[in-house]
């Protein structure tokens, strides 16, 4: 992909882009896709990995830490949710971990477990036993979270497994490995649930996500690099793209090294969505201009929605 630049005294603008040729990340070969010419006054990179920005040679923030582990989510159906919910209430009294509510005759629930030792996890004995008997791997229990899905009364969504290796989400060979390992772990977790959880007797895997859940990959260098100090201090900005209080949520592949830190209210400036290299290029999603820890609070769906809205409003104002 080639970007045509227009020089300015302070910065540059993209005039148009077109596909020329693509390198595969494993250097096996090259191929030429169908050429597409795109001309626009503004460009928004919402690719997640900042693929558009990378292909026109934008600057990126340095990755000083390991990538957060990727996840592969799935659904199980055919579950007696009411039976499982009653059992959970008997086993777990921590309502910060397990909640079970009956709303209009339908049971809604959520529960979790991790291999971290910061809590007395009610589900820990079941995972310990399953590891000892070889039903699941030790790494399969690094992160386990389930919750009901509105309109699907016999289904639970699993926010796991979390792939335990340090893999690069920008490399095809690594994402392929993550998908393989994730699907194998899903099979093991499904057997575990059917054996140890009441209500799962007739349960089955009904869906596996088409894509990996990637928490962090490339981060564009923007006109402002948002920091964890900005976030923790609640620094105010003239042009906030969003306001949030979602915690700093940074996953790690090792035990007792993940971060889930509550925060006060904080703002993200629109300048952290603006490319340093091009005046008319924006990025939304996990690839924003923020340091590693701050990005861990801003990568979630609600914040990404707000980024898109903020950029759209900004561009609309520039065009009017």
Task: Name every feature range the model reports, one short phrase each.
Residues 3-37:
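Conserved beta-strand-loop-beta-strand element in the redox core of flavoprotein oxidoreductases
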Residues 18-21, 31-42, 47-320:
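Flavin (FAD/FMN)-binding glycine-rich loop and adjacent Rossmann-like elements that form
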């Amino acid at each position: 992909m080639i970007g045509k630049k227009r020089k300015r005294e302070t910065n540059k603008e993209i005039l148009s882009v077109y596909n020329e040729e693509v390198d595969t990340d494993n250097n096996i070969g090259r191929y030429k896709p169908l050429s597409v010419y795109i001309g626009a006054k503004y460009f928004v990179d919402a690719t997640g990995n900042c693929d558009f920005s990378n292909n026109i040679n934008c600057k990126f923030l340095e990755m000083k830490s390991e990538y957060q582990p990727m996840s592969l989510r799935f659904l199980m159906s055919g579950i007696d949710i009411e039976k499982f919910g009653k059992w959970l209430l008997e086993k777990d009294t921590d309502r910060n971990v397990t909640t079970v509510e009956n709303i209009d005759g339908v049971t809604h629930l959520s529960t979790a477990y991790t291999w971290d030792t910061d809590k007395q996890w009610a589900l820990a004995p079941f995972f310990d036993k399953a590891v000892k008997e070889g039903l699941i791997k030790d790494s399969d229990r690094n992160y386990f979270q389930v919750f009901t899905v509105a309109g699907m009364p016999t289904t639970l969504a699993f926010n796991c497994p979390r792939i335990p290796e340090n893999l690069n989400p920008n490399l095809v060979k690594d994402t392929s490995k993550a998908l393989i390992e994730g699907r194998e772990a899903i099979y093991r977790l499904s057997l575990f649930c059917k054996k140890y959880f009441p209500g799962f007797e007739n349960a089955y895997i009904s869906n596996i996500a088409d894509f990996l859940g990637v928490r962090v990959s490339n981060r564009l260098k923007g006109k402002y690099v948002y920091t964890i100090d900005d976030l923790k201090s609640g620094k105010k900005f003239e042009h906030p793209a969003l306001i949030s209080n979602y915690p700093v949520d940074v996953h790690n592949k090792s035990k007792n090294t993940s971060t889930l830190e509550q925060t006060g209210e904080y703002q993200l400036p629109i300048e952290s969505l603006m490319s340093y290299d091009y005046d008319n290029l924006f990025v939304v999603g996990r690839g924003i201009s923020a340091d590693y820890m701050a990005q861990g609070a801003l990568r979630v769906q609600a914040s990404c929605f707000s980024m898109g809205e903020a950029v759209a409003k900004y561009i609309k104002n520039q065009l009017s």
